[in-house]
């Protein structure tokens, strides 16, 4: 959203990332203000790539290329959320195993695969050679290594290649981060068609999507020992196992666009906007987390959403308004017209 509406501020963000790398040897993953042990993934690569792919310039992009390559193959010696915890396993096996003492391993694997795709896209935009890019293009497909055809879900995997058993799609935490397999299976932002193919086509894919809403908001909180607030929010929202109060699944509804059922996306998007973003004391649906939850609303209210940052593409949803005009910094206007738009249409 910042790249679209406030590109001048985005330049400053990129300059800040350069400075963080120069001063610490790592890009920040959860800065407050220094490196903090929080969350998983190497998503600074996404922030860097999305800015450059969307035309943001005026900073040292080559230094950021050096940084994303460096961070993909090391971990901070004191802050394990910075860089890539488990990178040695990931580079060798194509996934972070669930039985080597690394928590939230499946979530890490899925995010690293997307991060590798971001590195590939960033390098491609910079004009890097195919020999430099090919390892990251291949690694972007590592999400396939966690797909368990028995369940049609992403499942933690042991170092010897076997899938974790016993397995419950309702178990929060463990191999995942503040969520369960029903949430994280869809974390293939960069290759929805590949995930559709794994599941056997549009129909089984859409049926699996439907199941997220149809399965009651039951849960297994044994990893935490108590229901964390994200679990409680899922229960209160009462949209099955859809947990909009936390970020891992917020792109999920838009995936109906990929399997030929955009009307389902439109209905669910409007339901979320109407129910979980209101001017009431309990009118906000969960974590804000660096602006993501509100950015989801702003994009969705305008009628489109960036399912995959760094792709330069937007999925079509349903605007709240019949006419939306965005005044671009260039002086041009971006306009969305939906004259027949209504609560029923």
Residue spans of the language-model regions?
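Core alpha-helical transmembrane segments of integral membrane proteins
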Residues: 1-2
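Generic internal hydrophobic packing segments that stabilize the cores of diverse globular domains
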Residues: 10-14, 45, 49, 65
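Active-site core of glycosidic bond-cleaving carbohydrate-active enzymes
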Residues: 18, 45, 55-141, 145-335, ...
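Aromatic/His-enriched, Gly/Pro-containing loop or helix-boundary segments
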Residues: 24-44, 49-53
């Amino acid at each position: 959203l910042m790249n679209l509406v406030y590109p001048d501020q985005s330049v400053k963000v990129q300059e800040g990332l350069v400075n963080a790398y120069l001063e610490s040897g790592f890009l920040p993953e959860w800065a407050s203000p220094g490196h903090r042990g929080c969350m998983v993934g190497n998503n600074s690569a996404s922030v860097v790539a999305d800015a450059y792919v969307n035309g943001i310039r005026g900073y040292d992009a080559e230094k950021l290329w050096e940084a994303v390559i460096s961070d993909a193959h090391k971990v901070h010696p004191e802050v394990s959320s910075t860089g890539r915890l488990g990178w040695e396993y990931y580079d060798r096996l194509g996934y972070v195993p669930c039985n080597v003492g690394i928590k939230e391993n499946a979530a890490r694997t899925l995010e690293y695969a997307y991060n590798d795709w971001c590195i590939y896209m960033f390098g491609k935009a910079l004009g890097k050679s195919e020999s430099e890019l090919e390892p990251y293009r291949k690694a972007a497909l590592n999400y396939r290594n966690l797909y368990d055809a028995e369940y049609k879900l992403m499942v933690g995997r042991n170092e010897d290649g076997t899938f974790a058993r016993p397995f419950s799609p309702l178990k929060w935490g463990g191999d995942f981060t503040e969520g369960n397999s029903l949430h994280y299976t869809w974390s293939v932002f960069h290759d929805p068609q590949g995930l559709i193919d794994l599941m056997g086509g549009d129909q089984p894919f859409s049926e699996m999507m439907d199941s997220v809403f149809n399965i009651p908001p039951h849960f297994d909180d044994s990893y935490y020992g108590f229901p964390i607030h994200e679990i409680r929010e899922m229960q209160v929202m009462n949209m099955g196992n859809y947990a909009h109060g936390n970020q891992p699944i917020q792109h999920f509804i838009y995936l109906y666009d990929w399997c030929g059922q955009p009307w389902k996306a439109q209905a669910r998007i409007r339901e979320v906007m109407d129910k979980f973003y209101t001017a009431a004391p309990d009118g906000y649906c969960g974590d804000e987390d660096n602006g993501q939850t509100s950015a989801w609303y702003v994009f969705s209210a305008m009628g489109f959403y960036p399912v995959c940052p760094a792709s330069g593409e937007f999925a079509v949803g349903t605007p709240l308004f019949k006419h939306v005009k965005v005044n671009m910094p260039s002086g041009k206007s971006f306009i969305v017209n939906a004259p027949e738009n209504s609560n029923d249409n």
